[in-house]
Amino acid sequence: MLKYCAEIWDEVRNRRPLVHCITNYVTVNDVANIILAAGASPAMVEYPAEASGFAPLASVLYFNLGTLTGEQEAAMLEGRWAAASRDVPLILDPVACGVIGRKVDLIERIKSLGKIQVLKGNIAEIKSLAGLAGKAQGVDSLDTGEGLEEACLQLAVKDKLIAVATGEVDIVAEENRYARIFNGTPLFQNITGAGCMAGGVIAACVGAAPEEAWLASITGLLAFNLAGERAASQAGNRPGTFRTLLFDELFVLRGEELMKEGRLEW
């Protein structure tokens, strides 16, 4: 599997997919820059009238519900509707959906307009959408992760999508299969927006290989986590330094290194 992940990672730079992002204002700059570091091209188009015209031109859509405004909500609905006829894949991060019911309603409305290819969240968010009890404090998960594989598979089957759960060990599931990703670093917990950035890198990979969305999702998360590991080894216990190095390490990461250093189980 690592061989295929390496090929997809290098393909991102070859294809330079256009990633249409509607994301939260806390992390929008970091998301744009991490997508650039991955080798893709970000476009932060949020005005509804513009989103409906732009979304069909994109390689992939990335919607993040972190600081959801009425204008963003309208843009997501317009964009998903307009892009559905072109089969543009959608990656959705349902930030805090377990504690803000309005976001669950929006997810259902988006699903009614077009398929969600990948749904990426923390443990509490994934369990909540799978119909299980998850513990959350605001946007952060307090869940231990017990039963996470089953929750991801349940959500993947229920909504016919790829479920990505981030935690101490990350899970990427579709229908009757899943992979565990063991790369990563605790320093991700000390910066704002690690999950948002991970979603952006996943979107870049799915945009480059939409026909292999499960492998592309694994590739994006694996690359982001490995870049984090490498950054942490140089940063010590300094989150500001770590954040800067994260962009640098992702930018220089190549498929051959991903194949050698990636730690997967499937």
UniProtKB/Swiss-Prot annotation:
It catalyses: 5-(2-hydroxyethyl)-4-methylthiazole + ATP = 4-methyl-5-(2-phosphooxyethyl)-thiazole + ADP + H(+). Disulfide bonds: none annotated. InterPro entries: Hyethyz_kinase (IPR000417), Ribokinase-like (IPR029056). It is an enzyme of class 2 (transferase). Pfam families: HK (PF02110). SUPFAM superfamilies: Ribokinase-like. Belongs to the Thz kinase family. Its EC number is 2.7.1.50. The lineage of its organism: Bacteria, Bacillati, Bacillota, Clostridia, Eubacteriales. One of its GO terms (biological process) is thiamine biosynthetic process. Pathway: Cofactor biosynthesis; thiamine diphosphate biosynthesis; 4-methyl-5-(2-phosphoethyl)-thiazole from 5-(2-hydroxyethyl)-4-methylthiazole: step 1/1. CDD domains: THZ_kinase. Catalyzes the phosphorylation of the hydroxyl group of 4-methyl-5-beta-hydroxyethylthiazole (THZ). ATP binds at residues 120, 166. Substrate binds at residues 44, 193. GO terms for molecular function: ATP binding; hydroxyethylthiazole kinase activity; magnesium ion binding. This is Hydroxyethylthiazole kinase. Its cofactor is Mg(2+). It comes from the Bacteria. Keywords: ATP-binding, Kinase, Magnesium, Metal-binding, Nucleotide-binding, Thiamine biosynthesis, Transferase. It comes from Syntrophomonas wolfei subsp. wolfei (strain DSM 2245B / Goettingen). NCBIfam families: PRK09355.1.
